[in-house]
Amino acid sequence: MKQLVIILFMSAFFAACGGNTDSNTSTAESSSSDSKKSETGNPSYDPERGEGKFTKVEVAEKLDVAKAAAGEKVYGVKCSSCHKLTSEKLVGPGWLGATDRHTAEWIMNFTTNTDAMLNKDPKAQAQLEICLVRMPNQNLSDDDARNLYEFMRKNDGVK
């Protein structure tokens, strides 16, 4: 009797988990690809800047030590569980060289507008394919994003 109950429970569990049909999947895929086509065809979208409110970030040649220190605190609280300061992937990509690969605007837009960037930006989508996990919204303020960018510059060797 106990085995019968276990078998019935497992059958019900697997039936509940597997409710995806081909028609639902194809509809979701086609609407997703349609939205990607319309978004990437948008002439106002700048892949060097990304999607968000940061259009021009003034970055001094010399590192702002105070901002970098504040950014290191943000990293310790909100970023270090998923990102290493090396090029090694943890959950998300490693940060070494990030400021060489992306503009300040792109990084700050990504950290403050993650979902829109993951839905629209080709570079963010490529990282998502590698990491397989969407970065959750960290609710960073504009100052936190700027300080975090300065810490990333410090990590990349800017003095």
Model regions and ranges:
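Sec-dependent bacterial lipoprotein signal peptides
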Residues: 1-15
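Bacterial signal peptide processing site
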Residues: 17-21
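Second-shell loop/turn segments in exported
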Residues: 26-27, 94
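Short pre-active-site segment immediately N-terminal to redox-active cysteine/selenocysteine motifs
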Residues: 75-78, 86, 134, 144
